[in-house]
């Protein structure tokens, strides 16, 4: 933060609340895949489908997935479109594919007890979750996390010492993800 001029600095001394965006401000801004569950007999094709679609996206989570998967055979995608609320649909090898947050799973996708438990575990851990279904069959669940900046907690403590009463964390991420980062930083 850069403050210029004595009036601005004086006015800033009366600030009692500071709102921070999470991604790239309090976290490093480079999410990484921490967990991957596959529910398919053909993991090679499944990972190629995932990589082929995610390579078309500039979303930070898509970039993390592509990096994690490494080089994969690229399959032609058709009828690709972004889903409002967090996902993408496409047709690959004549099959309908949906990738995104849990909301992209249609009601036709029936989760096994293992899949439901894996999703619940990642949600409870505060991971950002990306799922992929092919023809309404869940095939991939990914847990993705961004690391808190090493000096963020100390900087927040300094703001408190300077008299800032409230430090607020703002994010469009899943509530559990935001809670995990807030706990790590000592925010309430």
Per-range role (PLM):
Residues 1:
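Conserved catalytic-site loops of classical short-chain dehydrogenases/reductases
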Residues 4-188:
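Cytosolic catalytic headpiece
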